[in-house]
Amino acid sequence: MSRSCELTGKGVQSGNNVSHANNKTKRKFLPNLCNVTLISDALGQRFRLRVSAAALRSVEHRGGLDAFLLKADENELSMRARLLRRQIVKKAAEAA
């Protein structure tokens, strides 16, 4: 399991700890990942995803998992999220 968000692609970054004496040592900045269960209204199913806290706020802001995935860029999504997005688009096309 990689340390990256399945919805936004946010991952590990590297940088430096900088002391008061300006000594620099390498460090990693890890994303704040949470294992969450999100519900798809279109598919009527629950999906367990590993997302960052920022992505979780974005999902809430856009009005749920379906709306977030429809607006999201496919390049940022994980393979599981891309498959889920395609299923939602297909279901929406059938309903229309």
Swiss-Prot record:
HAMAP family: Ribosomal_bL28
The keyword Ribosomal protein is assigned to this record: yes
Composition skew (Polar residues), residue ranges: 1-22
Stretch list, region Disordered: 1-24
A Gene Ontology term for the protein's cellular component: cytosolic large ribosomal subunit
Membership in a protein family: Belongs to the bacterial ribosomal protein bL28 family.
Organism from which the protein derives: Rhizobium meliloti (strain 1021)
Keywords, comma-separated and alphabetical: Ribonucleoprotein, Ribosomal protein
Phylogenetic classification of the source organism: Bacteria, Pseudomonadati, Pseudomonadota, Alphaproteobacteria, Hyphomicrobiales
GO biological process: translation
Molecular-function GO term, any one: structural constituent of ribosome
Primary gene name: rpmB
InterPro entries: Ribosomal_bL28 (IPR026569), Ribosomal_bL28/bL31-like_sf (IPR034704), Ribosomal_bL28_bact-type (IPR001383), Ribosomal_bL28_sf (IPR037147)
Name under which the protein is recorded: Large ribosomal subunit protein bL28
